[in-house]
Amino acid sequence: RNGSGKTTTANIIMGHPDYEVESGIVELNGENLLEMETWERARKGVFLSFQYPQSVPGLQVGNFLRKSVAAILGDEAAKGSEFRKKLKESMKELDIPASFLGRYVNDGFSGGEKKRFEILQLMLIKPKLAILDETDSGLDIDGIRTVAKGINAAIRGTDSGALIITHYSRILEHVQPDKIHVLIAGKIVKTGGPELALELEEKGYDWLETGSDK
């Protein structure tokens, strides 16, 4: 539900400066992320796909991607034929044309282009934890399928994980979740497997607030 704390949770994990955590820890691979700066969390493998990505006029997509990969994975990862091959393969997977690289970051992008660009970054960086904040929002069925294909390609065969924040179960038809958590008023009120998504589609959320399972 809107206002339940989903985006707040994502921003806290990533280290947004507007949020202060008074207690608790956020642990990844045995390390407390709350003790790190945002850039340190990124280098440790945390990636956040924004719900509303900002445009950056004057910065070309190709340059942005190369610099991003270099900043997270090191300069060598952003050089040579191997990087170009991976970039080309990832763009093909997401149905992104080569001309996209010459455009400015999110400048004049459609909603679908912004979402695919976020997933393109995910595929190139291959983080340990990808936080995808309503990546499926505003997409049609084909768009959801394409984005899901990119998510699967990024985490398949790795020890990486994805925290997918969504209002709907449609994307879960293409990205198989291990666990589903329902967040209401800042608290996890229900946890289950993939079948929980179907139950929520059928019943909505009111039964979780009232405590009834009818």
Where in the sequence are the language-model features?
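Helical segment within the ABC ATPase nucleotide-binding domain
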Residues: 144-159
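Helix-to-loop junction immediately C-terminal to a conserved catalytic motif
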Residues: 14
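ABC-family P-loop ATPase nucleotide-binding domains
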Residues: 54-128
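Conserved beta-strand-loop-alpha-helix hinge in the C-terminal portion
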Residues: 179, 183, 187-210
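Conserved H-loop
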Residues: 159-167
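Walker A (P-loop) phosphate-binding loop of ABC-type ATPase nucleotide-binding domains
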Residues: 1-5
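ABC ATPase NBD Q-loop/coupling interface
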Residues: 25-41, 106
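Walker B catalytic motif
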Residues: 134-135, 142
